[in-house]
Amino acid sequence: MTRNLKIITALGTGLMLVAGVATIAVAQATSLVSVALSQGDVGEQADGYLGIKGAANAALRAEVDAINIKRRAAYTQLAAQRGVTIKDVAAAIGCETLTARVATGRAYLLTDGVWRVKGAAPITLPAYCVS
């Protein structure tokens, strides 16, 4: 995955961000998800999807699932265009999202499975992310 991920990131980050993150930003406009993000109950994951930290009600779970379904559809399209795996595209977007979209005070999940809250320092990205 590392080689393909670096190639995808190096060659197509701008296009992926336009196609993928624009969809993500629109999808995250729901009030339940926005509130949960601000409270640290929902956060970005290194795998390119939203995650729920701890227990959540059915309505929040449904909205997070709906967002992740839209993300997967965007990742699937990009993967087909580039001839790579969906997982590689999702991880590349995950790297960009952790870098550019996780605000101070927001929760995020790295590949080690530990939820963290972003402080003033940049997030230490997984080794497969191109810096």
Residues covered by each model-derived region:
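Bacterial N-terminal signal peptides that target proteins for export
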Residues: 2-13
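Sec/Tat signal peptide C-region and signal peptidase I cleavage site
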Residues: 21-29
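Amphipathic, charged alpha-helical segments and their helix-to-coil junctions
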Residues: 29-44, 48-55, 59-62, 90-131
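Core hydrophobic alpha-helical transmembrane segments of single-pass membrane proteins
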Residues: 13-19
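Surface-exposed patches in mature extracellular/periplasmic domains of secreted proteins
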Residues: 63, 75-93
